[in-house]
């Protein structure tokens, strides 16, 4: 894992060398690692202008499940995205933050977004009939024209791709499974798939600590830290 991470950082340094020398110097000095006391499958390093979140594969020791670049919206973030794109680095999924439009596949993570006061970012859900959050059920009954309306995107194992496309989400929150073979049509939408592997943590505190990652995604980092602590 350390070798993979080191190689990844070398790639990123190369990307910024070709686009912005001052940014490269910042990168070369390294970033600030977010402290995780209990989570074992998540590492986040903050750099100037973006953060890198690395999810280790809970089923394959030493392998990486997914790597995300969390890039703030705005002009500075636009330049960071250009640097990533010019490097043709297909191993990194860029997520513009804060996410304000998302499709959430699990009731657990819907509840977490409510705890983080980020429920307005829930625009679509899967398995609506199993979501025990009264407000989500009420929002699903609202007229489609209502800004608070939540769309039922069908079964999480075979979601309605057309409905998801219509929502224009900035991210889709999915649960990874061992040997799943990917996410079918969702993989082809060019919409960031956030693989919520928190349930594979061995301890309840480890699972809960992932809220720091979700807080960063939805612009609720301080709320997540406060909630966890």
Which residue ranges define each predicted feature?
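Bacterial Sec-dependent N-terminal signal peptides
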Residues: 1-24
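N-terminal ligand-binding lobe of clamshell/alpha-beta domains
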Residues: 19-229
């Amino acid at each position: 894992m350390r070798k993979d991470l080191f190689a990844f950082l070398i790639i990123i340094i190369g990307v910024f060398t070709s686009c912005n020398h001052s940014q490269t110097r910042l990168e070369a000095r390294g970033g600030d690692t977010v402290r995780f006391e209990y989570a074992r499958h998540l590492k986040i390093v903050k750099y100037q202008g973006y953060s890198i979140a690395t999810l280790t594969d809970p089923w394959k020791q030493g392998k990486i499940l997914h790597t995300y670049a969390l890039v703030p919206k705005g002009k500075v973030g636009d330049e960071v995205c250009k640097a990533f794109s010019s490097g043709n680095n297909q191993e990194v999924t860029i997520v513009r933050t804060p996410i304000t439009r998302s499709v959430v596949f699990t009731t657990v993570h819907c509840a977490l977004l409510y705890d983080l006061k980020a429920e307005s970012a829930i625009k679509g859900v899967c398995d609506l009939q199993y979501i025990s959050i009264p407000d989500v059920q009420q929002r699903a009954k609202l007229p489609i024209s209502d800004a608070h309306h939540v769309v039922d995107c069908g079964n999480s194992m075979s979601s309605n791709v057309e409905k998801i496309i219509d929502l224009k989400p900035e991210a889709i929150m999915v649960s990874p499974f061992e040997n799943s073979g990917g996410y079918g049509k969702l993989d082809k939408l060019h919409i960031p798939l956030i693989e919520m592997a928190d349930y594979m943590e061995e301890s309840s505190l480890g699972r809960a600590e992932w809220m720091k990652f979700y807080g960063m995604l939805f612009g609720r980092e301080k709320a997540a830290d406060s909630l966890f602590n």
